[in-house]
Swiss-Prot record:
Gene transcribed to yield this protein: STKLD1
InterPro entries xref list: ARM-type_fold, Kinase-like_dom_sf, Prot_kinase_dom
Region (Disordered), start-end ranges: 1-23, 621-640
Protein's UniProt keywords contain Repeat: no
Residue ranges occupied by any Protein kinase domain in the UniProt entry: 28-379
Family to which the UniProt record says this protein belongs: Belongs to the protein kinase superfamily. Ser/Thr protein kinase family. STKL subfamily.
Composition bias, Basic and acidic residues: 1-13
Domain of life the protein comes from: Eukaryota
Gene Ontology terms, MF aspect: ATP binding; protein serine/threonine kinase activity
Protein's UniProt name: Serine/threonine kinase-like domain-containing protein STKLD1
Keyword DNA-binding (UniProt): no
Binding site for ATP: 34-42, 57
Record keywords, A-Z: ATP-binding, Nucleotide-binding
């Protein structure tokens, strides 16, 4: 289906694609077409499953050989992980049968605003672009280019329209091109050499005197930083590429020797390093002195790294828990300043997780400093290195804590923000692709539970495949109690949110019963599993029969008896067991099974010992913010349901 702004021609389906078998374009819906780029057409599409918008650049190739060469050359783009480079999701080759042409397709991030549009808007308004903002963007672009050049990758198509703005102060490079495709001179001459900028560049190269005129005009007009540009442009416009200024020289001229400023502190990597012996000597003091060193040497990543390592080894009493606001602030600032350095991100996340964990253990009543800065910093780290498993586990664990530690209104806001950022889809993608990584699965399920806890779901569609994903996870880790516990929590919340389809009820009930049998000693697992069972049984007689039917390992009713005997002194567990019995007893066909299984004696004992606590309005069965779908109907308390069961003959 084509969007209203489309040009009316739908691409035919792909034939080959390393990232997706069969027909890759089948999983995308074309919404509209952007202005053509230098070498191809840019389509804004939506993934059919996740509803996430992407950009697909389609480049027409002369033949199969050229397409295959270009695909091979561009495959390294899939591994690029940098805060200021757009993530490439997929590359594939497709055949357009309508015009008998072969296309290379590059699937990239979608962002509405580019630097080109900022320039055009300022021209229309006859306004000057803020110099400090421009310098900050330039620093990020240079940082990204240095990273690419370090990997021997050349952008080949750098221009304002290929600098996208993720936010007001964060840009990314996109639309890297291939040397193979750039050799198509006919297409390149038509689309690229006809621009005013290209004519100007050729003119300046051919006539050095004209460049002097331009620079003199800039000086006369008092253009900001004209002197810096005067030092840069002659070297950048050399005809022979080997004579041109390198990216490191550009950084040195603009940010180290010049007056430019940028928040992209990886540029400070060009400074001389501080010897480890001196760093260790500076870090011998207490927390206050270490923080002072970190602040005084904020631009030296090696100092920041060793300082955080030192803090990680400190005992809780020296760290000053529950919270030292200045410590958290310095760590977050370090993450933001050194977003290019993976070791810094890993160490900072480990330290934040350590601080959160220690504070919750030693001071459970203390509220964490889970402010926007922490969430933003760790989320930025995740997007910069989305496939780095060790970082992914740390970030998932941190976000799970920060989301649940906020007040209810703040937590809902954070949960919505994270969902809008695509975190839900990210979790599901990695539960599927990283099934062999236990830590990814456990932390992913924990964060999924935290996002679902408030019941504010931006888009329920992706959640429909969660039961099947969890089934795969539990099949992979059949004896893992922690995995089962995390899974039961997610199943319970999904049942309350109505995100489990009727055809999935039997499967989910079986998995919940299996988890209880596996880990009767885990109270949290038991509570969440029985809550999930009660929620499903309330709305489905099929689920109720699945609980009571005799299967391998015994029936659910015998399991209920075992649970009660093990946890009879825990009111919360007994309440959740009682709620399940109430919903089972609401089906006439199930009542005979309850009686024949000698459940009346158990029910009588629960009634006598816990009647006062078995009131649904005060039950842990319902969580604030969650819809009432899994809760008893008004007036239907557990104690009332148990009365009916006892009276049944």
């Amino acid at each position: 289906m084509l969007g209203p702004e489309s040009d009316g021609r739908r691409p035919t389906q792909g034939e080959r694609g390393p990232g997706y078998p069969g027909e890759p374009m089948d999983k995308y819906q074309v919404l509209y077409q952007l202005n053509p780029g230098a070498l191809g057409v840019n389509l804004v599409v939506e993934e059919m499953e996740t509803k996430v918008k992407r950009v697909i650049k389609q480049v027409e190739c002369m033949d199969d050989h050229q397409a295959s060469q270009a695909l091979e050359e561009l495959m390294p783009l899939l591994k690029l992980r940098h805060a200021h480079i757009s993530v490439y999701r997929e590359l594939f080759i497709m055949w357009n049968g309508e015009i008998s042409s072969l296309y290379l397709c590059l699937v990239m991030e979608f962002n509405k605003l580019s630097f080109q549009e900022v320039i055009e808007d300022k021209r229309k308004a006859k306004e000057i672009i803020d110099s400090k903002w421009m310098q900050n963007v330039l620093g990020q672009v240079l940082d990204a280019l240095e990273y690419l050049h370090h990997l021997d990758i050349i952008h080949r198509n750098l221009k304002p329209s290929n600098i996208i703005l993720v936010s007001s102060d964060h840009c990314k490079l996109q639309d890297l091109s291939s040397n193979v495709l750039m050799t198509n001179k006919a297409k390149w001459n038509i689309r690229a050499e006809s621009t005013e900028a290209m004519y100007l560049r050729k003119s300046l190269r051919q006539s050095p005197g004209s460049l002097e005129t331009v620079l003199k005009t800039m000086e006369e007009k008092q253009i900001p930083d004209a002197e810096t540009f005067g030092n840069l442009l002659p070297g950048m416009l050399q005809i022979d590429p080997s004579d041109r200024t390198t990216i490191k020289d550009v950084v040195h001229i603009t940010f180290l020797s010049g007056s430019f400023k940028s928040s992209c502190i990886s540029l400070t990597l060009y400074r001389e390093t501080v010897p480890a012996s001196i760093t260790d000597m500076l870090l011998e003091g207490n927390v206050a002195s270490i923080l002072e060193v970190m602040q005084n040497f904020s631009g030296w990543p090696e100092v920041q790294f060793r300082a955080m390592k030192r803090l990680l080894k400190m005992p809780a009493d020296q760290l000053g828990l529950p919270w030292r606001p200045e410590l958290v602030e310095v760590v977050v600032t370090t993450m933001q300043l050194h977003d290019r350095v993976l070791d810094i991100q890993l160490c900072a996340c480990s330290l934040l997780l350590h601080l959160l964990g220690q504070a919750m253990v030693h001071h459970p009543e203390a509220k964490a400093l889970c402010n926007q800065a922490i969430t933003s910093a760790v989320l930025s780290a995740l997007w910069s290195y989305p496939e780095e498993e060790s970082l992914l586990v740390l970030v998932y664990s941190l976000l799970a804590i920060t989301t649940t530690q906020e007040s209810q209104s703040e937590s809902e806001s954070v949960s919505e923000e994270l969902q809008n950022a695509g975190l839900l889809e990210h979790i599901l993608e990695h539960l599927n692709s990283s099934l062999e990584s236990r830590d990814v699965c456990v932390s992913g399920l924990g964060l999924l539970w935290a996002l679902l806890l408030d019941g504010i779901i931006v888009n329920k569609a992706p959640l429909e495949k969660v039961p099947d994903l969890i089934s795969q996870v539990l099949a992979t880790y059949p004896a893992d109690g922690e995995m089962a516990e995390a899974s039961c929590g997610v199943f319970w919340l999904l049942s309350l949110l109505g995100c489990i389809k009727e055809q999935q009820f039997e499967q989910v009930v079986a998995l919940l019963l299996q988890s209880i049998r596996l880990c009767q000693n885990r109270v949290l697992l038991v509570n969440n599993a029985y809550r999930g069972l009660a929620s499903l049984v309330e709305v489905s007689e099929l689920a109720a029969f699945k609980v009571v039917v005799q299967e391998e390992g015994g029936s659910g009713l015998s399991l209920i008896k075992e649970t009660y005997q093990l946890h009879k002194d825990d009111p919360e567990v007994v309440e959740n067991v009682g709620m399940l019995l109430v919903h089972l007893a609401s089906y006439e066909e199930i009542l005979p099974e309850l009686v024949s299984s000698s459940m009346k004696a158990l029910v009588q004992e629960i009634k006598e010992r816990f009647t006062s606590s078995l009131v649904s309005d005060r039950s842990a069965f319902s969580k604030p913010g969650l819809p009432p779908g899994g809760s008893p109907q008004p007036g239907c308390t557990a104690s009332g349901g148990l009365e009916q069961m006892i009276a049944w003959n």
